[in-house]
A protein has these predicted regions:
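Intrinsically disordered, low-complexity
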Residues: 1-69, 134, 140-145
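Peptidoglycan cell-wall recognition and remodeling modules
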Residues: 46-145
Length: 145
């Protein structure tokens, strides 16, 4: 007569979620501990990018809070203010320029520099829509700008 095992020594050390993901418990815990720090870094980067945009908007003559709110909404929808954002269609950066290389006209570090991307995006908005609110209005009706 075989004696049944009370528990499998390998699977008993893994939670159901760990077994589903295939990650060892220690790796899962490390991800959970790291997540808040990465979130804080992301939020700090977003705040910094928005501050850069606010500063540059003044140079374009867009000083009103309304124009800033329009730009904030527009680029939140486009990229969540992430300078590393990349869409499947090939759009890149905070303003989601397509192709991303168009932003090279604003500076050599267009792939990674939020300031370069924001400068290019504000120039694009001025040339095509005149103001961030006009660009936002277009985005609301067409889901692109």
């Amino acid at each position: 007569m075989a004696i049944p095992l009370l528990s499998d020594p390998v699977t008993s050390t893994l939670s159901a979620a760990d077994r589903a993901t295939g990650l060892p418990v220690s790796a899962e815990r490390a991800l959970v501990r790291r997540a808040p720090r990465e979130r804080l870094r992301h939020l700090a980067r977003v705040r910094r990018n928005k501050a850069v945009a606010r500063s540059l908007m003044n140079r374009f003559g867009w000083r009103s809070a309304a124009q800033y709110r329009c730009l904030e909404r527009l680029w939140t929808h486009e990229s969540h203010w992430n300078e590393r954002a990349h869409s499947p269609s090939g759009a890149h950066g905070i303003p989601q320029a397509r192709p991303g290389a168009k932003m090279a006209a604003a500076g050599p570090h267009w792939r990674s520099s939020a300031r370069t991307q924001i400068r290019w995006g504000l120039r694009y908005i001025r040339a095509r829509y005149a103001t961030p609110c006009t660009a936002w209005t277009h985005w609301q009706s067409a889901n692109w700008y």
